Amino acid sequence: MCYDSPLIEIYEVPSFLNESECDQISALIKTKLRPSTIVHEGDYDKSIRTSSTCDLGHLESKVVSKVDERICSMLDLHKSYSEITQGQQYEVGQEFKEHHDYFDGSDLLIEKHTKKYGTRFYI
């Protein structure tokens, strides 16, 4: 299902993960949490993003590999164009404040962060 909006493309895939996959991924996320970060050079206000992140794609997990393959297949996307799969954990009161994911062209980070494509999924 695609939500119609002139501002963003959001897709919903009902039952994309089964209950067992959800349980396994949730458990994996809790094993390697680190403070979530933002793309920024130097010091920044850490209250912008207060969640924790797990880089699931760095874990050697069959369930994560299967889900990654399913995502790439559904989008007809070669795996080399996808980002490392991540999972986020938010405790009560934690947040990722309103922001824009873009580089304006003058940003020194553009070279580093636009060499590889990326897709975000929120489960």
Question: Where do the protein language model's features map onto the residues?
Answer:
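Fe(II)/2-oxoglutarate oxygenase catalytic core
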Residues: 1-123
